[in-house]
């Protein structure tokens, strides 16, 4: 039986809790996605802790909501964030996400703000040595997660964020870690839209775990500077979202597509309305 795009979207669409502002009641986020008939969710640690992990697990089970991603672990260059990995893996044992997102961390530490535990040689950017050191830590983390039956999704980070967020910046640089294990890549269009390997990887690779998507804002110097909602009316420099979603929709596996924007991307827009209109806005792209 051939499924329609609507039927596929009903199965595959997820939305990440990063969108939900901290000052909003986290329960309202769950209530809104249930009302919008979205069956999958991505979670981040601050949301989990505001909700309470046991209460959140009950709500997800009650409403039959699948967890596509738990965000994030790794951050191998900054001890403060790196030391939280065990806590987040313990959350994964309870919430059972399809993947726990792994982000390598900035050459200068991070994510922002830098912690007081972070130190570096400020006179030189020793990128090759930091990548070498992190490679060992990634392998150790993969082995630990495998022993816990937790699947990880390593995320390539756009090279323009190498100093503050991630120092493995391409699909090819991340794939080398995925041999002989069940871990995969999480592809975020915001970070990988210009990757040479993107199209073929999304179409065919068995190492794709999840596609995170949104539109992109560019600053006056044409650098990525934030995320945008899915527009019905095309604007200048929109990504060809339809193309990338079709790649996932045409796959024979159960790979999900996860909408991800952040509170600072809302620009005064009501997150509830964004959630309620998301399915329709995506489907209108295919008309």
Language model features by range: what are they?
Residues 3-7, 77-184, 194, 246, ...:
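Active-site acidic/histidine proton-transfer and metal-coordination neighborhood
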Residues 19-21, 45-49, 73-76, 104-108, ...:
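Active-site-proximal loop/turn and secondary-structure-junction residues that shape catalytic pockets
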Residues 52-63, 136-145, 200-201, 243-248:
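Catalytic-core regions built around general acid/base machinery
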Residues 63, 148, 181, 204-207, ...:
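Structured helix-beta-strand junction loops
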Residues 1-99, 128-129, 146, 181-184, ...:
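N-terminal pre-domain/capping segments
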């Amino acid at each position: 039986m051939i499924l329609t795009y609507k039927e596929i979207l009903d199965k595959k669409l997820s939305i990440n809790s990063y969108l939900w502002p901290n000052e909003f009641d986290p329960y309202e986020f769950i209530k809104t996605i249930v009302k919008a008939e979205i069956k999958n969710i991505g979670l981040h640690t601050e949301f989990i802790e505001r909700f309470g992990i046991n209460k959140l697990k009950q709500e997800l089970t009650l409403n039959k909501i699948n967890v596509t991603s738990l965000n994030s672990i790794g951050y191998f260059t900054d001890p403060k964030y790196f030391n939280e990995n065990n806590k987040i893996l313990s959350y994964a044992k309870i919430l059972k996400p399809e993947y726990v997102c792994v982000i390598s961390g900035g050459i200068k530490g991070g994510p922002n703000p830098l912690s007081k535990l972070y130190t570096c040689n400020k006179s030189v950017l020793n990128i090759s040595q930091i990548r070498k050191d992190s490679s060992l830590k990634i392998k150790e983390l993969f082995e630990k997660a495998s022993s816990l039956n937790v699947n990880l999704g390593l995320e390539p980070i756009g090279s323009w964020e190498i100093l503050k967020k991630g120092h493995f910046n391409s699909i090819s640089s991340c794939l080398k870690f995925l041999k002989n294990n069940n871990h995969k890549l999480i592809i975020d269009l915001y970070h990988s839209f210009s990757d040479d390997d993107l199209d073929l990887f999304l179409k065919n690779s068995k190492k794709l775990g999840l596609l995170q998507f949104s539109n992109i804002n560019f600053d006056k110097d044409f650098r990525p500077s934030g995320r945008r909602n899915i527009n019905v009316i095309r604007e200048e420099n929109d990504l060809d979202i339809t193309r990338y979603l079709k790649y996932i929709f045409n796959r024979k596996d159960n790979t999900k597509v996860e909408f991800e924007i952040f509170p600072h991307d809302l620009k005064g827009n009501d997150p509830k309305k964004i959630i309620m209109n998301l399915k329709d806005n995506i489907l209108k792209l295919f008309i």
